[in-house]
Regions:
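A structural signal for short, well-ordered beta-strand segments and their strand-loop junctions
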Residues: 16-19, 71-75, 134
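Conserved nucleotide-sensing/catalytic segment adjacent to the nucleotide-binding pocket
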Residues: 1-49
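Short, internal active-site loops enriched in acidic
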Residues: 23, 78-83, 137-141
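NTP-dependent small-molecule kinase module
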Residues: 114-200
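A glycine- and Lys/Arg-enriched "phosphate-lid" helix/loop adjacent to the NTP-binding pocket
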Residues: 30-54, 64-116, 163-170
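Conserved catalytic network of the ASCE P-loop NTPase/AAA+ motor domain
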Residues: 7-11, 63-69, 125-127
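Alpha-helical scaffold elements adjacent to nucleotide-binding pockets in ATP/GTP-utilizing enzyme cores
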Residues: 1-8, 26-30, 56-60, 83-86, ...
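Flexible, active-site-adjacent loop/turn segments at secondary-structure boundaries
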Residues: 7, 20-29, 33, 96-98, ...
Length: 200
């Protein structure tokens, strides 16, 4: 269940955003008893499978952190009443009809089960290197503000910098600068000589 997430990891220096990700496999899969349909050895489907998956997730996220990944996990918590109002708005407001899905209505029947599993998931997988941030999400402006502050702090902690240029590249840039300032930027041959390290 982790392979699809693992292969979608961002390259070093890039940022990746996962919507739900591997955490579906310890929540949705349990709500709807989908584990029996997974193509995994049957002897692995036992009473310890969820504890095992929690451990695997913690181990995987620790591995990522130890290899330079900065992990931010945000849980947007919408109340049951607010969810009801938003679903009603999607039905009543023509401009929001495109957001409507009957699946969202059906899932509300499992609200309590979801809340129990979300709580367990957060407790089992929130760690020092990969903590969960639980953000109240009834008020969208407040949610966006809190999330932006979480991301901003993380970016400040990471303190990203532009790649360092080699001495050779810096020298080539100076030559290009001279070409531009002298009005000779169109002289392709001369620019090619500069790239080769020449200086005619």
């Amino acid at each position: 269940y982790m392979w699809r997430i693992n292969k979608a990891l961002p390259r070093r220096g890039n940022i990746g955003i996962f919507n739900r990700s591997h955490y579906e496999d310890v929540v949705v899969t349990r709500v709807h008893d989908l584990i029996e349909n997974d193509k995994i050895p049957k002897d692995l489907v036992n009473k310890n499978i969820w504890k095992t998956r929690y451990r695997q997730i913690r181990d995987w996220e620790r591995y990522l952190a130890e290899n330079g990944f900065h992990i931010i996990k945000i849980f947007l918590h919408v109340s049951k009443d607010e969810q009801r109002d938003r679903l009603a708005e999607r039905i009543l407001n023509k401009k929001k009809n495109w957001k409507f899905s009957i699946a969202d209505i059906n899932e509300r029947r499992f609200w309590d089960r979801y809340q129990d599993l979300y709580s367990e998931m957060i407790e089992e997988t929130s760690t020092e290197k990969a903590p969960w941030y639980i953000v109240p999400a009834d008020n969208k402006w407040f949610t966006r503000y809190v999330v932006s502050q979480i991301v901003l702090k993380a970016m400040k902690d990471i303190a990203p910098k532009f790649p360092e240029m080699s001495k050779e590249i810096k020298e080539q840039l100076e030559e290009f600068k001279k070409l531009i300032e002298s009005g000779n930027i169109g002289m392709i041959e001369e620019m090619q000589d500069v790239m080769k390290g020449g200086n005619k």
